[in-house]
């Protein structure tokens, strides 16, 4: 497969590595971008997958809560520009969609779009909004939480771009909000080690083993190094293993233990995460216009 300059450029942006290192990795993986990144991580050539999880789309994350605070719905609605994201009509639509999710409990986005909202379907209302604001509008995803008996729901919004909802077993509203704020800031992958996907753990172990092998140390030392790195990795990605943002001397797990509470589940949305927006090259655009003039 031919390795193009644009492929090398993308890999450089995602890893922070040099041009020749990127070209070599792409050649060795026959142009497979993800495989090249993994290969470079194993060899230590990749500084970080900088592009992964990059926020690119605009819109809002909104939350609706039932009057008795036992049910919550969180929705992400996307548009093309920050200007429209702040538009009153767009904001009203996003909030009404969250209310429909809360009351109607649709199974998925397709079912949601067919539900009634103020005399028309959500899809029809979306189409009307597109005509009004002049931009594409998409209801991307939603989550609905319902507290079990004796449970507590909490939510937190950081501006209009980040939303977190959490369900606690035990605890109170203040603790739930503190946990939500922590999740917003620290981005845990899951609640605890039991929820870490085995595939993800195996992949990280393989990468850590390849990195440790570069040291040339004996196998038993390498195994200890890998175990230590896995332990640190799990503490970084699990909610209960992370240092609590308001008191870094204790973990979230210890905070919950002291309050006699557990986190059943949480949801964290950030506007546009995982969606890549087209990058405009204004120099090329001006050149094209000049040639056409």
Curated annotation (Swiss-Prot):
Transmembrane segments: none annotated. GO terms for cellular component: cytoplasm. One of its GO terms (molecular function) is translation elongation factor activity. It comes from the Bacteria. Keywords: Cytoplasm, Elongation factor, Protein biosynthesis. InterPro entries: EF-Ts_dimer_sf (IPR036402), Transl_elong_EFTs/EF1B (IPR001816), Transl_elong_EFTs/EF1B_dimer (IPR014039), Transl_elong_Ts_CS (IPR018101), UBA-like_sf (IPR009060). It is found in: Cytoplasm. Pfam families: EF_TS. Residues 81-84 are annotated as: Involved in Mg(2+) ion dislocation from EF-Tu. Associates with the EF-Tu.GDP complex and induces the exchange of GDP to GTP. It remains bound to the aminoacyl-tRNA.EF-Tu.GTP complex up to the GTP hydrolysis stage on the ribosome. Belongs to the EF-Ts family. HAMAP family: EF_Ts. This is Elongation factor Ts. It comes from Thioalkalivibrio sulfidiphilus (strain HL-EbGR7).
